[in-house]
Amino acid sequence: LMDDGPFDKNPHYVRLSTPKHAAKRTGLENEGFFGIGVKQGESYRFSVWARIPEGENSARIRVELVDTKSMGENHDFAVSQVVIDSKEWKRYQVIMKPTQTNPKATLRIFLEGTNAVDLEHVSLFPVDTWKGRENGLRKDLVQLLADLKPGIFRFPGGCIVEGTDLETRYQWKNSVGPVENRPLNENRWHYTFSNRYYPDYYQSYGLGFYEFFLLSEEIGAEPLPILSCGLACQFQNDDMSAHVAVEDLDPYIQDALDLIEFANGDVTTEWGKLRAEMGHPAPFNMKFIGIGNEQWGPEYPERLEPFIKAIRAAYPNIQIVGSSGPNSEGDQFDYLWPEMKRLKADLVDEHFYRPESWFLAQGARYDNYDRKGPKVFAGEYACHGRGKKWNHFNAALLEAAFMTTIERNADIVHMSSYAPLFAHVEGWQWRPDMIWFDNMTSFRTCSYYVQQLYSTYKGTNALKMTMDGKNITGADGQNGLFASA
């Protein structure tokens, strides 16, 4: 493994050289995430940055897609050779067409001949991606998103923004520019749970903020990026020394200002120019930005305040989303809401991962919210049935009831988003989730269909519905009746 590669943010590469023993071969193997799903006859683009470090003027590598469970004739079912013809770094690519469908293929690269080869940024992607984009997204997964007709798309997530520590927080500037020059980062969830340990689960940033903005545009949703406020995950970092001091927040605040410029700036600006170079000269017209995720305590508003001042001064039309903490009620929640009003946040993010009984009791939750303060963003929610960790109909029904509450109070609850959105059937952080997938297929849940119903058939006016002079809310002994019109 070498560390003087051609990309300053991603300098590591591997050198393959001939083994001394004639019966041995030098190579690399990548099994993907629970295998690599490929389909017979479809095209897959293999690419690699490579050079010859010494010796002759050409070298050759053999690229294989392999069924590791078979030692018969179909053991390798897609084979290509790539000739490396330069001592300077170049990108090489070849199209591979598997002769069989295999949900758990393995990619292998072998050195052929006696000349050493340096390899960097090895990639294998379907040619047939969403919108046909090179290194693009899986069509079936994005189509499910588009079919939801979403109004808002929050990215890159919640706790991943904070990081296990500040060093591993999500830094958007590392996720834009050429894909090969985006540095690897630890994934927030790869060892958090002892019963689900994925030591190779890292972020390559191949899906970065540019791709998120582009995806938002293509599915018709307003982008809502979330940035670090200088607090690492507070669940894992009790000591304030793990966080950025308020007086040292300037680089974090500048990141927020630069992101707005990247999304909306003219092509003559530094970050607007980069957006144009990546293929999108027109602005993305971003309207919202979130600062912090599930932060709590006085340390959060004292860090949020300078962000708000700076963003208001430079971009007064951008709406700022603050946080009400990780809980839907209690001391932290009750402390942060008045603070968000004091700071004049535009929206306050509330999160609800609660049991069925909680959702059943929320019919009147927003009836008495202050209409003069910040609006509500129900940024993460899902009904977690006790002892029923998978998606089930009763949970979806109660989520629908909660959405009726939101719809009836649309003057105060401006946005909502179910979470988590996607989960792989063999590697998930928790359950339930809206869309499940494996290496070949994807599956809608009952919660998905509820979200689709409400997003497709949006109301335009709320009519007051009463019984004996009281709003019909499902609360106050009304036996769980939820109504909206």
Residue ranges and their predicted role:
Residues V48, K149, S216, L259, ...:
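Conserved, mostly hydrophobic/aromatic
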Residues V244-R354, G363:
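Hydrophobic, small-residue-rich alpha-helical packing segments that form membrane-like cores
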Residues E112, F155-I160, S228-G230, I291-W296, ...:
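Active-site beta-loop-alpha junctions enriched in small/polar residues
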Residues G151-P156, E222-L227, K287-I291, Q319-G322, ...:
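Structural recognition of the beta-strand scaffold that forms the well-ordered cores
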Residues Q40-E42, N461-A485:
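Surface beta-strand/loop "capping" patches
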Residues L1-S204, E222-L224, N237-D250, L257, ...:
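Extracellular and organelle-lumenal recognition/adhesion modules and their flexible linkers in secreted
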Residues F110-E112, D118-H121, P126, P156-C159, ...:
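Active-site groove signature of glycoside hydrolases
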Residues L214-L215, I308-R312, P316-Q319, W337-R342, ...:
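Catalytic-core region of carbohydrate-active enzymes that cleave or remodel glycosidic bonds
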